[in-house]
A protein has these predicted regions:
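Phosphate-group recognition and catalysis centered on beta-loop-alpha active-site segments
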Residues: 1-255
């Protein structure tokens, strides 16, 4: 199993490749992350109507196409999606690329019913020993572990399936809502980790606290925090003892 806990420094994780430096969830974003230097490349996995797994954060085509089209990503076939977003890779494309380079991979599974398929593909490409698969879905985590027990899995919290934290109209409400979720988190985390078999707690920085980090570590789990894009916030979460930090711009880690 891949190294998940903090050693002499926190693990550096490029969010959606390097979303600040290239179109997110593309091989170009992966390459930019590798150029800067990361320990893991994170990306999202979503299913299409034809069963193809692709790299996309949500079902909102407006978001995935960066404003070029509207509709539902999951209602499209691969050839239809590629007419709108030609550079969007399939999950197999991503695994093929990552198998050819030296970096860890973090697959954030957005499709609850495809955990078996995701784990089997990671195994087929020989990447189990440097992979983490995470999800908000307990079903997906169960299926991932059932298919490949050696695969490290992470429980994502809170769920942001529809990218609400990125929507401007909701932005003023997000910090308070997230803080409320974080208050009860320390006492709930040990039970959730045990129930899901998760090796990592993937936590939004807004719910993070010293108590949450300590409870996870006491339960034998690592703590990775998302999405950290400011130097002051980076210093704060590192001081709390997190094991991994996810950022849109991995150049932040060089400061």
């Amino acid at each position: 199993m891949t190294e998940l806990r903090r050693g002499d420094r926190f693990l550096r994780i490029g969010h959606r490749g390097a979303a600040a430096l290239a179109p997110e969830n593309t091989l170009d974003a992966f390459r930019r992350a590798l150029e800067v230097g990361v320990d893991f490349v994170e990306f999202d996995v979503l299913d299409l109507v034809d069963g193809t797994l692709v790299l996309a954060h949500s079902d909102d085509l407006l978001e995935v196409s960066h404003g070029r089209a509207t509709g539902h990503v999951r209602g499209l076939r691969l050839e239809e999606l590629r007419e709108v977003v030609p550079q969007l890779p399939t999950f197999e494309d991503a695994l093929g690329f990552l198998a050819s380079v030296e970096v860890g991979l973090h697959a954030d599974v957005k499709c609850e019913r495809h955990g078996h398929e995701v784990a089997a593909a990671i195994r087929r490409y020989g990447l189990v020993d440097r992979a983490v698969a995470s999800s908000f879905s307990w079903r997906a985590l169960h299926d991932l572990r059932e298919t490949e027990p050696r695969l490290a899995v992470g429980l994502t919290y809170p769920e942001d399936r529809h990218g609400l934290t990125r929507r401007r109209l909701l932005a003023p409400l997000v910090p308070n809502a997230v803080r409320l979720l974080g208050r009860a988190l320390p006492r709930r985390l040990p039970r959730w980790l045990e129930s899901t078999g998760a090796n990592v707690a993937m936590l939004h920085h807004g719910v993070l606290s010293q108590a949450a980090v300590d409870r996870c570590h006491a339960a034998g789990a690592a703590v990775w925090v998302w999405t950290v894009n400011e130097a002051e916030l980076l210093s704060h979460v590192v001081a709390l003892g997190v094991d991994g930090v996810v950022s849109d711009d991995p150049r932040l880690f060089l400061q």
